[in-house]
Amino acid sequence: MVMVCVALVVPARAQGPDVNKVLADIRAKDQGQLAISEEDGRFLRLMIASGQRKRVLEIGGASGYSAIWMAQALRATGGRMTTIEYEPARAKELADNIRKAGFSDIVQVVAGDAFAEIPKLQGTFDFVFLDAWKRDYKKFLDLVFPRLEKGGLFTAHNVVNKKGEMEDFLDAIQRNPALWTTIVSPAGEGISLSYKK
């Protein structure tokens, strides 16, 4: 009788970037309070994953905290994101944080004025996250809405705690017959969700 022993060798999984550490480092350095809350980040990740979103636009990337939350979901959906940041130094920090978190292959960082950069982008979007100058929210909606796919979500941050700075935007998303809109507030700042019918 011959006995054959077969050993299955499973290679050790390569350790990737510690995304939680990158997120914690960004929060620790966020002196200007520009980053969204962790609760809002988890909410955005869930919205992208559950909706199987694949083409995401972020307007106002800051240091990359929200982009990293969304990129986690995009890794699962096979999607990609473009994030735009106006301040050059902050855009560099954003790109560095995206690289440290291991998402450079799916997140494109654009430094510049979003009003000038968005028209240069190709294609449409199925998810938009807006967290830029509050007084410009309505202008961004007008610029991006034609490129939001049917069934897409247009989301905006700070719609509760800074609603006085964006009344025209809030009125527009509530009255537009092509949108179903609601507002949620996981951490008190508020996120509007507008679904394009």
What do these predicted ranges mean?
Residues 10-129, 134-197:
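A short alpha-helical cap/connector motif
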Residues 1-9:
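Bacterial N-terminal signal peptides
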